[in-house]
């Protein structure tokens, strides 16, 4: 090797390698997430670009690639971009892992009719709980997960706490370590509080009622356990605090338990869709409310 080549090689070796940027697939999903959080009538390229940290030109190219695939559409008049009906059809098909939503839907309908309150079905997804289904009652409430598909860190809200408390110990500890910085964002939650609540839920068999995060709201949830006693979902009631006093709470818990116990034996214990590891689920969400 001559001296000039050697100097070039030494210089190349000494130069720190830059970390690769996000792939086109990652950028596309970032744009899809931004669209999902946009106003109902859609979003503009400028706002989407700001939300995802990409140039307007890059976002424009991604949007038109997504339009070509049929998952995004652009309004001819407003020129706003939004997720298409085809996208939601795909999401609906994928949003029923192991037939869990189909299995639990009758229970949600019965509970909503019996209680007159909003009932949620939550399932675990990595470090989060995801709202898989809702049966809405007559009272206007706010929830941690919002609508179907909404996410919240495991440990925040009654439904996600009911799931977290009945996970295997090693998995539970990993989730607690990862989520403690996230739950602190709610002001009243820290690791001591979280661990105390988990132990309380394990002793009582349910999570409730007023988290203290939102005045005037309350909730209660029970885990849906598989045949090994591990939580795969939670049934949760969200309502006004005045409707979940000491006199009514035992009845609500009992109705939730009956439905959860009826669902549990029907769950396939070998279904890998319900045993996904937590690794890699590091996206932080910010929501507020009950359930």
Indicate where each model-derived feature is located.
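N-terminal helix-turn-helix
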Residues: 2-98, 102, 261, 265-269, ...
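Short, solvent-exposed recognition segments
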Residues: 2-11, 140-215
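Signal-transducing coiled-coil/dimerization helices and immediately adjacent hinge/linker segments
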Residues: 272-291
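Amphipathic alpha-helical effector-binding/dimerization core
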Residues: 78-178
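Extended hydrophobic
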Residues: 190-262, 279
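Amphipathic alpha-helical regulatory segments at dimerization interfaces
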Residues: 34, 51, 102-114, 120, ...
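Short amphipathic alpha-helical signal-transduction/dimerization elements
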Residues: 36, 160, 164, 168, ...
